[in-house]
Amino acid sequence: MKVAKASLLTILAHSVSARFLAEDEINRVQLYPAGSEPEKYLIELAPGDTRWVTEEEKWELRRNGNRFFDITDHKDLGATRLRTKTKSVFPEKCSLQDKVKPLLKDLDKSEIQKNLEKFTSFHTRYYKSDYGRQSSEWLLAKIDSIIKDAGADKNVYAQPFPHTWQQSSIIVTIPGKSNSTVIIGAHQDSINLWLPSILAAPGADDDGSGSMTILEAFRTLLKSKDIVSGKADNTIEFHWYSAEEGGLLGSQAIFSSYEKEGRDIKAMLQQDMTGFVQRTLDAGQPESVGVITDFVDPGLTGFIKKVIVEYCKVPYVETKCGYACSDHASASKAGYPSAFVIESAFEYSDNHIHSVDDTIKYLSFDHMLEHAKMTLGLVYELGFTDFTALEKKGESVSEEL
């Protein structure tokens, strides 16, 4: 898509939060340098539905509500595990209330707010920008400080997962008694879909809210001595993905690596947008969390519903978001059980995203706290699940919901 200089000026003029651009700087904004052809990317909009597009065409598709994988570098994701994939098995009910409920009391919405205020202070967290690199470096340093403050730095560790672009993904590992792994994820990047490299993208809800929600769940989880000392049956990981907005690029890279390494991933939950409830309330509906039911593992999703009922003050609603709608899709494509919980029914989700207006003022930290409760409850319950015994027992709750 080519943008005339006049159109570019109009976009910038209406973007009140954009940084100041002088006339000569606007003249230097070129979508394609003279004499060069735009780079093309292979995207997948549905299983088997692929096409080559330019980066500008990617953003145009996103502005029109289309989601996709950018499979340029990961055409074979899932090919290995497709031959070995087994049916997932999850507990019939929650069983660790005596351990989880005391931890829930330590969740602190003021911590979520404080961290989100900092996270949204970066001009953008666009994955190809220096701001995106800086925000990722801040997040990694924050995670390291949480680990150190908890006295967990002998066993728990955080590492960047570098990419070919500026912003690294982040992986935190809490070793357990086995290498079987439970993953909690969110994406750390933000985007302004008009001019990603220039315009502000605070990304408070998308996905600053999810990133800081799981950060608070992680901080609170480290208060468990059993978790920190490695007594959980399974290893636990927290992921903050880069480049979700570009076509699930960061999560594809990670799960492609895990697939090649033969990693045993028992469950992956994505938290993408956890703070917006106003459209739900305006529609006369009760506050709730949205449990995605399409392109997810039904057994894991069924257990998450039980976790919400057990540990949250708000109910859940079933909703759908389509193909490749967040990073859980990368885990699923790699052959791992994945699920996604969003802030509301999808039709009532935040309509300020991907713009300068995705700011904290629209968000509910009480609602984020409910997502944190669900996250903490799930990761603790599954962290201490003996999946080997469960599979031998033949206790399957993976039937169609």
Curated annotation (Swiss-Prot):
User: Does Hydrolase show up as a keyword for this record?
Assistant: yes
Q: Where do the annotations place Zn(2+) 2 binding?
A: D206, E245, H354
**EC numbers, comma separated:** 3.4.11.-
Prosegment location in residue numbers:
19-87
Under which main EC class is this enzyme filed? hydrolase
Any GO CC annotation of this UniProt entry = extracellular region
Q: Which residues form the signal peptide?
A: 1-18
Disulfide bridges in this chain: C321-C325
Gene3D superfamilies named among the record's database cross-references = Zn peptidases
Q: Which domain of life is it from?
A: Eukaryota
- Kindly state what the record says about how the cofactor is bound: Binds 2 Zn(2+) ions per subunit.
Cofactor(s) of this protein: Zn(2+)
Q: Which CDD domains match?
A: M28_AAP
List residues binding Zn(2+) 1: H187, D206, D272
What Pfam families does the record point to? Peptidase_M28
- State the compartments where it is located: Secreted
Query: Which InterPro entries does this UniProt record tie to the protein?
Result: M28_fam, Peptidase_M28
Q: Which GO terms describe its molecular function?
A: aminopeptidase activity; metal ion binding; metalloexopeptidase activity
Which residues does the annotation flag as glycosylated? Answer: N179
Q: Which UniProt keywords apply?
A: Aminopeptidase, Disulfide bond, Glycoprotein, Hydrolase, Metal-binding, Protease, Secreted, Signal, Zinc, Zymogen
Assembly description:
Monomer.
Q: What does this protein do?
A: Extracellular aminopeptidase that allows assimilation of proteinaceous substrates.
Similarity field: Belongs to the peptidase M28 family. M28E subfamily.
Q: What is this protein called?
A: Leucine aminopeptidase 1
What organism is the protein native to?
Answer: Colletotrichum graminicola (strain M1.001 / M2 / FGSC 10212) (Maize anthracnose fungus)
